[in-house]
Amino acid sequence: MTLHAYLGRAGTGKSTKMLTEIKQKMKADPLGDPIILIAPTQSTFQLEQAFVNDPELNGSLRTEVLHFERLSHRIFQEVGSYSEQKLSKAATEMMIYNIVQEQQKYLKLYQSQAKYYGFSEKLTEQIQDFKKYAVTPEHLEHFIADKNMQTRTKNKLEDIALIYREFEQRIQNEFITGEDSLQYFIDCMPKSEWLKRADIYIDGFHNFSTIEYLIIKGLIKYAKSVTIILTTDGNHDQFSLFRKPSEVLRHIEEIANELNISIERQYFNQLYRFNNQDLKHLEQEFDVLQINRVACQGHINILESATMREEINEIARRIIVDIRDKQLRYQDIAILYRDESYAYLFDSILPLYNIPYNIDTKRSMTHHPVMEMIRSLIEVIQSNWQVNPMLRLLKTDVLTASYLKSAYLVDLLENFVLERGIYGKRWLDDELFNVEHFSKMGRKAHKLTEDERNTFEQVVKLKKDVIDKILHFEKQMSQAETVKDFATAFYESMEYFELPNQLMTERDELDLNGNHEKAEEIDQIWNGLIQILDDLVLVFGDEPMSMERFLEVFDIGLEQLEFVMIPQTLDQVSIGTMDLAKVDNKQHVYLVGMNDGTMPQPVTASSLITDEEKKYFEQQANVELSPTSDILQMDEAFVCYVAMTRAKGDVTFSYSLMGSSGDDKEISPFLNQIQSLFNQLEITNIPQYHEVNPLSLMQHAKQTKITLFEALRAWLDDEIVADSWLDAYQVIRDSDHLNQGLDYLMSALTFDNETVKLGETLSKDLYGKEINASVSRFEGYQQCPFKHYASHGLKLNERTKYELQNFDLGDIFHSVLKYISERINGDFKQLDLKKIRQLTNEALEEILPKVQFNLLNSSAYYRYLSRRIGAIVETTLSALKYQGTYSKFMPKHFETSFRRKPRTNDELIAQTLTTTQGIPINIRGQIDRIDTYTKNDTSFVNIIDYKSSEGSATLDLTKVYYGMQMQMMTYMDIVLQNKQRLGLTDIVKPGGLLYFHVHEPRIKFKSWSDIDEDKLEQDLIKKFKLSGLVNADQTVIDALDIRLEPKFTSDIVPVGLNKDGSLSKRGSQVADEATIYKFIQHNKENFIETASNIMDGHTEVAPLKYKQKLPCAFCSYQSVCHVDGMIDSKRYRTVDETINPIEAIQNININDEFGGE
């Protein structure tokens, strides 16, 4: 029973001395007493290599490299193990989650958090922490009973103690945790003869838990000798750089005093690891107060990058230089990081440079398609077949892998499902998924082609296959009663899915193609899944459980699964975190992410028990718990020290100025401290360095081509570019080995997001030999030619969703008002409140079920919206009644369609126009309402257009002039052309072109006293006042509002009179008859010009900016045109907005059938 301590700073030869000592013993007596080297799990492989790769050793049976848990198993092999079943991490958390749910009603502080998955994970960590530091439920209960404390803290500890106690009772005599097995190991030590003959070496640790100190105490007591290696100068100052390992030394001294033995200390002061003065000076001076600056010889570098991605690209380039120019091997290089965001960057960047690497971290399995399939399957059952988990399940492609183009079929199915609002048991309705229904996908139904029919039949078949599997799974699970039944049902369902065979086939294909890591992932996925099922049966067995609880517990288990990947080769870059990675004696170590906030890292308490509660508990209960945040914060300098002293040749520190989320970052204060130790240690700004040394960017062929592309693009933009890039281009271009993909990059250089003008033949192929279009299509072209090209040329359509769009609401109002108008023959004056309500209900019952597959009856929200629609209609009818009472114009025609060849007698004829290319223009559409008034054998007509949006319920004559608003003039033109079909007199003249805003008015009051019922009704009526343009003819004016008189402004039409009876400029929107005719004729010319441009093949991305607004704000095609408001302002078209449109139109000479100038 002897105890040795090798003490010294980093690189002083402590571990080398230990290895030399062990090797000498192995050479002297290969079959001698056992030698045990205890090291952290991350270091065991590296230390085993140190023995295996030694040519002087021919192998030995006496030396083993173990961590504490493996050592316990070695002892159990000799003296016998425990009889209880060992609980895995997943099994432990599943059991604790179930206990929490059962005990939820007894919890005082955590009752509301009990249902959350994360809470059981935190609670498991806390219980494991208690076990590591030998804190039992009895400790907690005794402490709570004897001490006065804050109510919150008391309730918290009582809750934890309750779960802890229940957990201990559940596992008693049946299960054992990893921490408990170590306690059992301590109890078995006296029985081990093998241990009594062993020489024990402990290396690579900087701190221990209470249970580990007890193990060390047992080893010291029962082993022949124990040697512990610590990185410390022996200073016990709590503010020393070596506080953490010195704390370990203090504990070892206490153990030695308890066992009444002395520690044979051996101090190591001579530095051996470092090959140069830079690293020696860095190690010796890092923690001194009085700095001794020396000249830097170039073995320490500090790199500053703009972004994290740029930072890792530069590290990759420098690794290539290390391999090519310095003759290093990949295994001589290590990268250490702390910010988890870097792990993703390593995976995405290093393969681009063909750098082999191994990240020493475990990755969660939760994002693997198989795990996502299983978790989505569980959620489908839990959520009663909601659409989101169903679509996630389908998109994993695990259950649909047997289908060709399965991803495309699933996309089509998703479109259909979202359009029809499929959820719940509607998935099972075969009639809903009839192939014929797919012809109605989108806004327009069409007849299916044979290819479309075959495709949609595959979609339906795929859906049926997946539904069959889900139903099988649901049936199997619903028949289960115990956990064992559920686990069996789950496994049998996976067999029914043929998942094992599918995974094994995929694994074999990956292995055959050399993708061994992905193949290993599949093995671990399946084995992990089986392990969770085994754990469930082990822990719960025949215990009854609801399906809901089982699926919750099962999901908890799946969350714990992690990939443990074995390195695929020995010669690879080692990557790990600064806190855990065990890399020693590397020629070059890169420390990335050296930013303030990462190194040092602000440490906050993450456990259920706060730092203050820990300190109070330790003081009052005389126990030790895991270190508090302030203690961990003090050790940050030691973490940096250990990380930077792993190298023996070069150390490169790097940091970025921008984080992964775009936040600004500062340099680590440790780098400022390191920089102060040396003269001439400057920070290298990477962009500036490459600007001065462009050849430094040319380290890897593929990446050089990408950087070359950026350089040539800058050159084309007249920026100054180094001649070396032009030389590089010529070399790559002329090399058959290097020029692969160069043509693609060069074509990208000239890409400027410009559309191409279509040829005459292609225009006719896209648009036809005649244009049959609505007014809105031409208005869309005026907004942006590309928008028209995308919608009517390429026929791009947005996915239709099962939700009410703005245009759906407009269609509803139009249909309802048409229905009611026809029922009363347009005589709104006859309506009373009872009749309004009756007609509204009738109309809604008739029309709403036809909207979006009965969307408005699909949920409580939409049923509420239906009632709101009814209220708006009732208010609208009241306003129409009021307007009809005071107008001589009578509504006569409703929702009147027009086209070149009418299909019925009720439809109107639209005159065909012709483009400059001779292409016919056939305009079609529908006029919401036509009001007429006849006097002296002359008919006057009003065009009334219902708008549900306030923004579109305004007639802007400037827009009319420039062809941006063509609807009203077109409608008036059509009506004037069809006097006979409308039953009008031989003489027909325009009355008004008016918009009616269908809405629910909001009236503002300053106070309750302002509310007056009569005034309220008047204000409501004013909100429905028609807007637009009125013929200034006195007959029209008198007929629009019979109340008009001097000093009166109408509240139903945009007309008002001055004191002298003349039209008020402020209250009137009027134009003379000739002007209206000119607008109509000019509108026709806009049609011809627009249609001619369309057939000319114009497809420019050229939105029209009007009143500082762009149509891009509401355009569906921005993801196609990629127009950017910040850099594409040169693309915008504008018009002269300062013109007076009436004066401008009057100055145009137009000859037409109306007898204009």
UniProtKB/Swiss-Prot annotation:
Pfam families according to UniProt: ADDB_N, PDDEXK_1, UvrD_C
Q: Broadest EC class? A: hydrolase
Cofactor section: Mg(2+); [4Fe-4S] cluster
Q: Does the keyword ATP-binding apply?
A: yes
Q: Which Gene3D superfamilies does its entry note?
A: 3.90.320.10, P-loop containing nucleotide triphosphate hydrolases (3.40.50.300)
**One record GO biological process:** double-strand break repair via homologous recombination
Q: Which domain of life is it from?
A: Bacteria
InterPro entries reported in the protein's UniProt record: ADDB_N (IPR049035), DNA_helicase_suAddB (IPR014140), DNA_helicase_UvrD-like_C (IPR014017), P-loop_NTPase (IPR027417), PDDEXK-like_dom_sf (IPR011604), PDDEXK_AddAB-type (IPR038726)
Residues annotated as binding ATP are 8-15
In the record, which residues are listed under signal peptide? none
Going by the UniProt record, its keywords in alphabetical order are:
4Fe-4S, ATP-binding, DNA damage, DNA repair, DNA-binding, Exonuclease, Helicase, Hydrolase, Iron, Iron-sulfur, Metal-binding, Nuclease, Nucleotide-binding
The entry marks the following residues as binding [4Fe-4S] cluster, namely 784, 1112, 1115, 1121
GO MF annotation list? 4 iron, 4 sulfur cluster binding; 5'-3' exonuclease activity; ATP binding; double-stranded DNA binding; helicase activity; metal ion binding
Q: Where is the UvrD-like helicase C-terminal domain?
A: 269-583
Q: How are cofactors bound according to the entry's free-text note?
A: Binds 1 [4Fe-4S] cluster.
**Record-annotated UvrD-like helicase ATP-binding domain positions:** 1-275
Its annotated function is as follows:
The heterodimer acts as both an ATP-dependent DNA helicase and an ATP-dependent, dual-direction single-stranded exonuclease. Recognizes the chi site generating a DNA molecule suitable for the initiation of homologous recombination. The AddB subunit has 5' -> 3' nuclease activity but not helicase activity.
Question: What protein family does this chain belong to?
Answer: Belongs to the helicase family. AddB/RexB type 1 subfamily.
Q: Please describe the quaternary structure of this protein.
A: Heterodimer of AddA and AddB.
Additional note from the record: Despite having conserved helicase domains, this subunit does not have helicase activity.
**Protein name as it appears in the record:** ATP-dependent helicase/deoxyribonuclease subunit B
- Lineage, broadest ranks: Bacteria, Bacillati, Bacillota, Bacilli, Bacillales
